[in-house]
Amino acid sequence: MSSGGLLLLLGLLTLWAELTPVSSKDLPEICKLPKEPGPCRSYLLYFYYNSVEHKCQTFHYGGCEGNENRFHTIEECKSTCAE
């Protein structure tokens, strides 16, 4: 392979490594759950970990059911899920 081809391959591999998201395999299971507002009708502001965007975000929790990917503060979300 020519040196130009090797440089192109190296550049593509570097770009791929930079753009590939960090694996979520090391995240606690609750952080992989989708946000789940539940069926009730309260309008409570909570935080959840968005495992696609790799960050904590707000959502409105209905006040019942839902799942464990629900935190009162962004600090609690980050300390549990943020990498």
Curated annotation (Swiss-Prot):
Residues with site note (Reactive bond for trypsin): R41, S42
One cellular component term from this protein's GO annotations in UniProt: extracellular space
Major place of residence: secreted
SMART domains in alphabetical order: KU
Keyword field: Disulfide bond, Protease inhibitor, Secreted, Serine protease inhibitor, Signal
Pfam short name (any one): Kunitz_BPTI
Every BPTI/Kunitz inhibitor domain range: 31-81
Compartments where located: Secreted
Cystine bridges: C31-C81, C40-C64, C56-C77
InterPro entries: Kunitz_BPTI (IPR002223), Kunitz_BPTI_sf (IPR036880), Prtase_inh_Kunz-CS (IPR020901), TFPI/VKTCI-like (IPR050098)
Tissues where this protein is expressed: Expressed by the venom gland.
GO terms, molecular function: serine-type endopeptidase inhibitor activity
Reported function: Serine protease inhibitor.
Family label: Belongs to the venom Kunitz-type family.
Protein name per the record: Kunitz-type serine protease inhibitor vestiginin-3
Organism expressing this protein natively: Demansia vestigiata (Lesser black whip snake)
